[in-house]
Amino acid sequence: MSIQRVIISGGGTGGHIYPAISIANAMQEIDSSIEFLFVGAEGKMEMEKVPKAGFKIIGLPIVGIQRTQVWKNLFFPFKLLKSLWLSVKILREFKPDVAVGVGGYASGPLLLAAKFLGIPYYIQEQNSFAGITNKALAAKAEHIFVAYP
């Protein structure tokens, strides 16, 4: 399978963003014709760092689950549904050959939408322990790439 279009999702922290940018840079070294689109969370650092690295990014209204201020989770289901709907729209418009999730809550809606649309997805886990999003989506991933054995 020839990969020409790749969508990369995730973010929230530099621990997710910089590995995502590194993946895109490494793939471009192999084949400079590959087209990339990043998807992150609105208002988070990826919305600034990814364009500075030379890639296009679209933000989703997704937020993480609050573990200390539980009342802030009241709008989470609505933001998740809107992010899922937008993810389906983004995937249908961009038509990627594969999706790559690098963790963080921003990757959840996009990888779920990719699964729904039959787009193969890969997970990259750079931490010694997988986060909630990567654990939840691991079962249907084509491959999982880890930094630690």
Give the predicted meaning of each segment.
Residues 44-48, 96-117:
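An aromatic- and histidine-rich active-site surface loop
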Residues 3-11, 29-78:
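Conserved nucleotide-sugar phosphate-binding/catalytic loop shared by glycosyltransferases and other
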Residues 26-28, 93, 109-120, 139-140:
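Alpha-helix C-terminal capping segments
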Residues 66-98, 116:
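An amphipathic, basic-hydrophobic alpha-helix
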Residues 87, 91, 105, 126:
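Glycine/small-residue-rich loop that forms an oxyanion/phosphate-binding "nest" at active or ligand-binding sites
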Residues 16-27:
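Short amphipathic alpha-helix
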Residues 2-5, 35, 115-149:
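Active-site-proximal region of nucleotide-activated glycan assembly enzymes
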Residues 56, 98, 142-143:
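Well-ordered beta-strand positions
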